[in-house]
A protein has these predicted regions:
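C-terminal membrane-cytosol helix-exit motif in multi-pass small-molecule transporters
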Residues: 1-16, 214-218
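A membrane-interface helix-boundary motif in multi-pass transporters
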Residues: 190-208
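Intracellular juxtamembrane helix-capping segments at the cytosolic ends
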Residues: 148-161
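Juxtamembrane intracellular "pre-TM" segments in multi-pass secondary transporters
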Residues: 9-46
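A late C-terminal transmembrane helix in Major Facilitator Superfamily
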Residues: 165-193
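Helix-to-loop junctions at the C-terminal end of transmembrane segments
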Residues: 91-105, 192
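C-terminal ends and interior cores of transmembrane alpha-helices
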Residues: 114-129
Length: 225
């Protein structure tokens, strides 16, 4: 280490070196506020948070809903989540690249949101006598939509920022995802108890429609910031 520090020359150009950030700039809440307030990506960042708030809300009560509405045990509930895992792996592991090349991230985000909305509405409207086919179809649709939305929306934010701003923005997106995932389940649980078993699904679908509106009104062109 001493040899490296004393003998090896600095190769990073002086003009490209960054000034160390101030302590207040490292505050995660300040970074989140800055990203949401950025006109280039603010709507998309807010959409990212609202998406995970809604999605993690109604998915958190799925097992309870399956038990109370369809009298499902662990086996059928596990099968439903297994379908989610398989479909999500196929979409994100093999299909997302060709689909982005053909449709672009913006259209894929809207398509994915439409699929998630459809899946979230199909679950509470499924006839108990057709529960297996209805629910398994619904969760496959949900997984397909989520597999499209998450990488596409993240890429939309990244492409609208300069290289210097991408790291902080993507870190803020991760924080927004965690915050939505943290707040969604308890909110859905309260709605489940106070407003009825289907309220998290219909409420989540309504929130996702707002997300779709925000994304659809975001600029299509890339904007460096």
């Amino acid at each position: 280490l001493a040899v490296v520090l004393t003998l090896l020359p600095e190769t990073h150009p002086v003009t490209e070196r960054r000034v160390l950030p101030r302590k207040r700039d490292l505050n995660p809440l300040a970074q989140i506020t800055r990203v949401i307030g950025n006109p280039a990506v603010g709507r998309l960042a807010l959409s990212f948070f609202l998406f995970f708030l809604a999605f993690n809300g109604f998915t958190a009560i799925l097992v309870l809903y399956f038990k109370q509405q369809f009298n499902w045990g662990p086996e059928l509930a596990t099968t439903a989540f297994l379908i989610v895992g398989v479909v999500a792996t196929v979409v994100q592991g093999g299909l997302i690249g060709p689909l982005v090349s053909r449709f672009g991230e913006w259209k894929l985000t809207l398509i994915g949101l439409g699929l998630v909305i459809a899946g979230s509405l199909l679950i509470p409207t499924t006839d108990p006598e057709q529960a297996r086919s209805g629910v398994f179809t619904a969760v496959a649709i949900l997984a397909s939509g989520t597999g499209l939305v998450t990488p596409s929306l993240r890429s939309l934010v990244s492409r609208r920022l300069s290289n210097e701003g991408q790291g902080a923005a993507l870190g803020s997106l991760q924080a927004l995802q965690s915050l939505g995932s943290f707040l969604g389940p308890p909110i859905a649980g309260v709605a489940y108890d106070l407003l009825g078993e289907t309220s998290p699904f219909f409420g989540g679908a309504g929130l996702l429609m707002l997300v779709m509106l925000l994304v659809s009104r975001s600029p299509l062109e890339e904007t460096a910031a």
